[in-house]
């Protein structure tokens, strides 16, 4: 038995030596760090850009949208997709970062963006003519390494040049899907290397002839579903009224895919017309759920201090006391162990084997039916 064991040990040494030589050659040809053992480098946890709302930060699991990754936000019309993206831009700017907005829909309202806290003077905006131009501009900005976030609004509006130059009614099967696939292949590596977050806003379509399950699908083919580290499904669930007037929407955001934290978490929050997402409303909701804010009848109380009777008055009180709102935000994040307060968890993080969609038929086809 001894000679066999020695032979095995010698073979292992030869393999190890051959591997070291191969790794040395790879580093010589492609640069240091081109290949390494995963345990050799002490990687910091994935950093994030806050979303601007604590409910979304908690649902995302790491305190915001991950840096260096692709994020997709999709939902029906007027559900709050652009509002969520603009809040994220405002947070990136507050942290000293630079953000870009690729307005393929040509529908960005500067006044609304300013009301949400976006520094419109510093925001980079492009209104491209074609889908190729939009994605090329986004890629160049990412590769510059100078920006922290780029938002593309929306994938559905990224019209291929061949379609624009062609006649109305011409069939252009799969052009947009191929365009998105090529762009994401190019951008993914650059996003990771520069730590830039790319948010793609997407629209919903309905498939023809679906008998079972949801007929809903997103535009742009399958590529974005695979490349996105986070996919958010956003929907209006209730109208908010002040008397007879509708003043906003109660909105639900579901994390249907998450490669950086456990998926399928849900955030509910209020979007007020002209103001955007109510930060104070989410603080009250999560504070009560976490037991930090006490609710007795209609009164909200924090450490013996009355915040107000009814949610509206308590929200107004927190608006007029931003230091207290910030303190509560931080304490809730600490209590729920989210973001900088997250502890190392034993459970594996979802990755390539994770289901891409909650609704399986989202991935049935790469190209939308031509009407």
Swiss-Prot record:
One of its GO terms (molecular function) is damaged DNA binding. Signal peptide: none annotated. It is found in: Cytoplasm. ATP binds at residues 75-82. Keywords: ATP-binding, Cytoplasm, DNA damage, DNA recombination, DNA repair, DNA-binding, Nucleotide-binding, SOS response. GO terms for biological process: DNA recombination; DNA repair; SOS response. Residues 343-371 are annotated as: Disordered. Pfam families: RecA, RecA_C. Its main location: cytoplasm. Coiled coil: none annotated. One of its GO terms (cellular component) is cytosol. It comes from the Bacteria. The keyword Nucleotidyltransferase does not apply. Belongs to the RecA family. Can catalyze the hydrolysis of ATP in the presence of single-stranded DNA, the ATP-dependent uptake of single-stranded DNA by duplex DNA, and the ATP-dependent hybridization of homologous single-stranded DNAs. It interacts with LexA causing its activation and leading to its autocatalytic cleavage. HAMAP family: RecA. This is Protein RecA. The gene is recA.
């Amino acid at each position: 038995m001894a000679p066999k064991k020695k032979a095995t040990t010698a073979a292992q040494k030869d393999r190890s030596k051959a591997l070291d030589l191969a790794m040395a050659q790879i580093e010589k040809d492609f640069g240091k760090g081109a290949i390494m053992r995963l345990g050799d480098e002490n990687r910091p946890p994935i950093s994030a850009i806050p979303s601007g709302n604590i409910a979304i930060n908690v649902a995302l699991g790491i305190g915001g949208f991950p840096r260096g990754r692709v994020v997709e936000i999709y939902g029906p019309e007027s559900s709050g997709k652009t509002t969520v993206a603009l809040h994220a831009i405002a947070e990136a700017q507050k942290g000293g970062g630079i953000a870009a907005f690729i307005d393929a829909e040509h529908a960005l309202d500067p006044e609304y963006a300013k009301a949400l806290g976006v520094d419109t003077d510093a925001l980079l905006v492009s209104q491209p003519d074609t889908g190729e131009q939009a994605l090329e501009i986004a890629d160049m900005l990412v590769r510059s390494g100078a920006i922290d976030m780029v938002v593309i609004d929306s994938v559905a509006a990224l019209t291929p040049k061949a379609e624009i130059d062609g006649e109305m009614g011409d069939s252009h099967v799969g052009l947009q899907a191929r365009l998105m696939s090529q762009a994401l292949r190019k951008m993914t590596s650059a996003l990771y290397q520069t730590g830039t977050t790319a948010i793609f806003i997407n629209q919903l379509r309905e498939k023809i002839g679906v008998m079972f399950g949801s007929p809903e699908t997103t535009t742009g083919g399958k590529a974005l579903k695979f490349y996105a580290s986070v996919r958010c499904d956003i929907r209006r669930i209730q109208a908010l009224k002040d008397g007879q007037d509708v003043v906003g929407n109660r909105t639900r955001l579901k994390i249907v895919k998450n490669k950086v934290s456990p998926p399928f978490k849900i955030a509910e929050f209020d979007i007020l017309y002209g103001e955007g997402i109510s930060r104070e409303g989410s603080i009250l909701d999560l504070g009560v759920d976490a037991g930090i804010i006490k609710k007795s009848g209609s009164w909200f109380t924090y450490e013996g201090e009355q915040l107000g009777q009814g949610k509206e008055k308590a929200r107004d009180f927190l608006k007029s006391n931003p230091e207290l709102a910030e303190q509560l935000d931080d304490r809730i994040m600490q209590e729920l162990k989210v973001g900088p307060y997250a502890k190392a968890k034993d459970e594996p993080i979802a990755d390539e084997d994770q289901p891409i969609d909650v609704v399986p038929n989202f991935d049935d086809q790469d190209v939308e039916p031509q009407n």
